[in-house]
């Protein structure tokens, strides 16, 4: 009975969520697009001509938002974007124009090599301007185990960023307040000159979800 009430409450909140309605109206696959939009408007992350990698991309709303931004550039011609987008997820994702998508597990060496090869090809040198990560582990409800999983995913995103970001590039990841959060912040501070937490309005108040932004590598690769 309690589970039923929880499901009904979630469904009611979801149906009446203004960001869900806005996403449906504007053609985004998920309300998550507005989390990135708000952070981008505050921090000016996405600019014409950039090479951007979207980790944990499915169902694709972040890639959709990035694509729309790059398509709006005055230099974008013949319906193409001014820049390049590479997206990856373990789950399938319906195709998005101008987005190169890899379905596979980011943690597997073969998939990781494929990602690196595509990044090298689209960037002309292997360096990217922005890495986005909306990756999150399957949570078990055991705080210590979930914290370890979240920290591991954050480490993977940071390792990729350290190897592939331009010196002035940026990394934005999703994480959660609670056990392990301070360790992720400290990891960011070791690698980035500027570190800033972000809690966009589209991120539900009840959720411990937050985002962490790192800019300008301290030790460029």
UniProtKB/Swiss-Prot annotation:
Broad class of the protein's primary localization: cytoplasm
GO CC annotations on file: cytoplasm
Coiled-coil blocks: none
Catalytic activity: uridine(2552) in 23S rRNA + S-adenosyl-L-methionine = 2'-O-methyluridine(2552) in 23S rRNA + S-adenosyl-L-homocysteine + H(+)
InterPro entries: RNA_methyltr_RlmE, RNA_MeTrfase_FtsJ_dom, rRNA-MeTfrase_E, SAM-dependent_MTases_sf
Glycoprotein is among the record's keywords: no
Binding site for S-adenosyl-L-methionine: 60, 62, 89, 105, 134
Localization in the cell: Cytoplasm
Family listed: Belongs to the class I-like SAM-binding methyltransferase superfamily. RNA methyltransferase RlmE family.
Function: Specifically methylates the uridine in position 2552 of 23S rRNA at the 2'-O position of the ribose in the fully assembled 50S ribosomal subunit.
Protein name: Ribosomal RNA large subunit methyltransferase E
Primary gene name: rlmE
């Amino acid at each position: 009975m309690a589970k039923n009430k929880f499901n009904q409450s979630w469904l009611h909140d979801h149906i009446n969520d203004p960001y869900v309605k806005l996403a449906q109206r504007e053609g985004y696959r998920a309300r998550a697009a507005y989390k990135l939009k708000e952070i981008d408007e505050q921090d000016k992350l996405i600019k014409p001509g950039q090479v951007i990698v979207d980790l944990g991309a499915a169902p694709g709303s972040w890639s959709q938002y990035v694509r729309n931004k790059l398509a709006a550039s005055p230099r974008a011609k013949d319906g193409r974007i001014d820049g390049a987008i590479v997206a990856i997820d373990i789950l399938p994702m319906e195709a998005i124009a101008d987005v190169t998508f890899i379905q596979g597990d980011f943690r597997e060496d073969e998939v990781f090599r494929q990602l690196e090869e595509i990044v090298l090809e689209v960037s002309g040198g292997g360096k990217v301007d922005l890495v986005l990560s909306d990756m999150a582990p399957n949570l078990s409800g055991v705080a210590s185990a979930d914290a370890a999983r979240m920290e591991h995913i954050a480490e993977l995103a940071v390792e990729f960023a350290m190897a592939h970001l331009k010196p002035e590039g940026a990394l934005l990841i999703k994480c959660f307040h609670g056990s392990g959060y301070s360790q992720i912040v400290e990891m960011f501070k070791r690698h980035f000159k500027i570190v800033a937490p972000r809690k966009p309005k589209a991120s539900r108040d009840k959720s411990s979800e937050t985002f962490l932004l790192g800019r300008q590598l301290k030790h460029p690769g």
